[in-house]
Amino acid sequence: MDQISIEGVKLSQELVTINLRHLTHIEKTLSQFCKNLTDNQINMQFLSTMRVDGNNQITCCVDSENSGFINSLIRSEPELQSHSEIIEPTGLLTLFPHHFKLKLLGLSLSVLGKASIPLYGLASSLSSLTFILAYHDLEKAIECLGEKIKIDPEKIERRPKIRVRQSRRLKQ
């Protein structure tokens, strides 16, 4: 079988994944949650919302250095406390196909499953396919995927070259 070619791969730094499920007021909860992150200068590396059979879910990932704040925030909000799951440490593995092929999604899921690599989340677009995995499984995932997908080692961004942080400094 021919390998599927992709344009590149990106691995994130160590993250914390937060799942908020079965939310009564998703818009209000998401708005307040995002406001709390913004007020505390915390950037989200990943955000996804979905609704299945009337149940709402928000999944987001933030830098692991914010783990303490996230845990405190969830403990302080009754709506969050009873509907949250925190998974850490996690990381994002993003594949950049030349053209999106459904075959790449199926093949990736099959390879990760056969390698017993837990999948905590997934998002896709025309230009990328992103998996939330245990942080310590990122390199193993690349190795396993490399057996079925043509990955140029030169096009693997192992960690972000630039880290962006928010600042309270105001323009004068």
Label each residue range with its predicted role.
Residues M1-Q172:
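A conserved regulatory-domain signal marking ACT and ACT-like small-molecule sensing domains
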